[in-house]
């Protein structure tokens, strides 16, 4: 497998630190609001990385954190009158619901920064003791970037770059690039260097050290991943702290996903142009949103478009149509050539666009074969096995094929439809075909199509519409 490393800015062969065992850390959300499509893209991108590595035979330990103490969360507390725990637990729960809808696998460990305060304090003390940090009275503990000779080597930035100014300014800092490890505040955690709360960059490096580190290795972990906006200053500052505290590099490989944009501008909460995952899930199934976000390369920036989202759904619809044709079939042996082509595409820095086109071709070929011989049990078994492989590697096709085509219909409406189908079944049994046809036509006027199968009558929405 080859992956694009953000430091050297080229594809590198992936060679794990320890045989077939891979340690991955992904920066998770700051939980003060609902997750937007940018969060979805990042989560899906590195879920695909994990799935691909597992499909290739690697064992993966996957950690994704929650930043649950931060200036934005504290502002939310002030505005809402709610406690830190009330806010963070609420948004963590909603985030996990979104991830479940997108078929993003749960991380092996999902640490919260507030669960690691003792380790963070110990880490800051270590940096103070070795001279890599200093105290500003009444403000906090700062990292001295001059103590890291490799500072800015990760992002490739220069001191003259304008966005160095993204680091909070303070006239008492030794250098404008220096950043807070600990912010003094009597309301929070006790430490011998002063009560306060941790800085964002320190939280992540400590969680990596606590949950993933193997001190026998040259690096703490194999892969550190996150959005491109985290490369500087967040990941740069994590790496600097690690070099000064651990005297080794943080990660062997660094991977970053591109932005979801609106009108060619990065989607973000701070810019006020976010399109929340929950908004998208009102108009398409989660798998369709996942398919859409996988249709472009994970490193590419792309503009969000409702039309493109629906186009992706139509591609997914076609796969589910094939799945419906296989109802009652028994899974057989998958096509090894098909599996190899998918893995080859994903092994090339997660080329999902190519992988999905290979799936499209398989679906077309399968439909042609079934059109010619709809009773070919062996072929049906092979196709079913192929689709199962697609499910495991690409994270789609988790939904029952009948329920998939009932998306957006309320439970109340589903109950009404079921009642009408029962009435129609009774009418057919009594040979009252006129009433049976009347019920079918009544449902057709509501854009509901009935299909009589050996296992009973099933229904689906016949076109894109809002049926409540």
From Swiss-Prot:
Q: Where is this motif: 'HIGH' region?
A: 29-39
| Residue numbers binding ATP | 269
Assign the protein's first listed, main location to one coarse class. cytoplasm
What InterPro entries does the annotation carry? Answer: Cys-tRNA-ligase (IPR015803), Cys-tRNA-synt_Ia_DALR (IPR015273), Cys-tRNA/MSH_ligase (IPR024909), Rossmann-like_a/b/a_fold (IPR014729), tRNA-synt_1_cat_dom (IPR032678), tRNAsynth_Ia_anticodon-bd (IPR009080)
One Gene Ontology CC term in the entry: cytosol
Molecular function per GO: ATP binding; cysteine-tRNA ligase activity; zinc ion binding
Q: Which reaction does it catalyse?
A: tRNA(Cys) + L-cysteine + ATP = L-cysteinyl-tRNA(Cys) + AMP + diphosphate
Q: Where found?
A: Cytoplasm
| EC numbers on record | 6.1.1.16
> Which CDD domains does this UniProt record tie to the protein?
CysRS_core (cd00672)
Entry keyword set: Aminoacyl-tRNA synthetase, ATP-binding, Cytoplasm, Ligase, Metal-binding, Nucleotide-binding, Protein biosynthesis, Zinc
Motif placement: 'KMSKS' region: 266-270
Cite the Pfam families for this sequence.
DALR_2, tRNA-synt_1e
Instruction: Enumerate the cofactors the protein uses.
Output: Zn(2+)
- Domain of life where this protein originates: Bacteria
Q: How is the cofactor bound?
A: Binds 1 zinc ion per subunit.
Can you supply a Gene Ontology BP term from the record? Answer: cysteinyl-tRNA aminoacylation
Residues reported in the UniProt entry to bind Zn(2+): 27, 204, 234, 238
Tell me its family.
Answer: Belongs to the class-I aminoacyl-tRNA synthetase family.
**Oligomeric and partner information:** Monomer.
Q: What is this protein called?
A: Cysteine--tRNA ligase
Write down the species: Campylobacter hominis (strain ATCC BAA-381 / DSM 21671 / CCUG 45161 / LMG 19568 / NCTC 13146 / CH001A)
